């Protein structure tokens, strides 16, 4: 018998702000006080229209240490280049999973053709914490294509994409340091889906767009909302009142101290000071 994870609240995203000149984002957490350990932050960008341009928009060279960035492209395309020698482009449906760990410098810019032609841009960026034991490990880059992500067709006509973790026997392609589940879920109007999630995981239902009833009690309706869920319980029931686009995340809590400063997330303020010093001294490398 399944036990539903409790809805801990419902929250709308913060006001729109720009990251660089290419990403108009709304923050879903932690700006509203939501804590979903091991996840640190979730920004939702778009949908926004960009006019054709000659120069790629985005965020230029900047550092990270101590965590992972996960970027999911829904519309538009983004190029990535980092000081560890990794580069790639993610197109609609693709995922970029970058492990900053001991430190990288990277840039994120609109891809050349998207820059030239313009169009609708929509993406999500999620920050995933690393345990203390892995914070200074070697940086890693996973460019995951749409074709590599398993798709589960649901009985009501919707589907679920398994980006990380396991759902209904299907394993996601992303390699993670701790137990993390990340699912893209599309539900058709009138569809009901009881989604299993591990007992002991923190979790959240993120609404990109639509109207969904959670566990028969709480509603997310509109665009860019989040409902954090309890650790206790092993399922969440989703009922779509309209065509609905969701992102479901769950993870085993790391439960370690978190010290953050801008692009660095460590365990102590001393480690943050060292990260700043290492970056300024060029120890995280430079873009060629």
What is each PLM-predicted segment?
Residues 1-288:
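Jelly-roll (double-stranded beta-helix
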């Amino acid at each position: 018998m399944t036990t539903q994870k409790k809805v801990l609240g419902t929250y709308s995203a913060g006001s729109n702000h720009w990251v660089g000149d290419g990403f108009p984002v709304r923050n879903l957490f932690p700006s509203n006080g939501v804590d979903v350990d091991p996840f640190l932050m979730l920004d939702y960008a778009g949908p926004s229209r960009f006019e054709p341009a000659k120069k790629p928009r985005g965020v230029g060279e900047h550092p990270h240490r101590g965590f992972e960035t996960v970027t999911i492209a829904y519309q538009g395309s983004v190029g990535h280049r980092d000081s560890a020698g990794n580069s790639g482009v993610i197109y609609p449906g693709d995922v970029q999973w970058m492990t900053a760990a001991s430190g990288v410098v990277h840039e994120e810019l609109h891809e050349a053709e998207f820059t030239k032609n313009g169009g609708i841009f929509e993406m999500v960026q999620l920050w995933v914490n690393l345990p203390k034991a892995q914070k200074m490990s070697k940086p890693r880059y996973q460019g995951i294509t749409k074709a590599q992500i398993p798709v589960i067709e649901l009985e009501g006509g919707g589907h679920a994409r398994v980006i990380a973790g396991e759902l209904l026997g299907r394993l996601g392609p992303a390699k993670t340091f701790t137990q993390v589940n990340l699912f893209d879920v599309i539900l058709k109007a009138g569809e009901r889906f009881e989604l299993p999630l591990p007992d002991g995981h923190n979790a959240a239902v993120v609404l990109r767009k639509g109207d969904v009833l959670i566990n028969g009690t709480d509603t997310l309706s509109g665009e860019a909302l989040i409902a954090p869920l309890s650790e206790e319980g092993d399922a969440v029931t989703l009922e779509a009142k309209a065509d609905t686009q969701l992102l479901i995340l769950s993870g085993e809590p790391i439960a370690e101290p978190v010290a953050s400063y801008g692009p660095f997330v460590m365990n102590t303020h001393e480690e943050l000071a060292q990260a700043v010093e290492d970056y300024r001294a060029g120890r995280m490398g430079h873009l060629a």
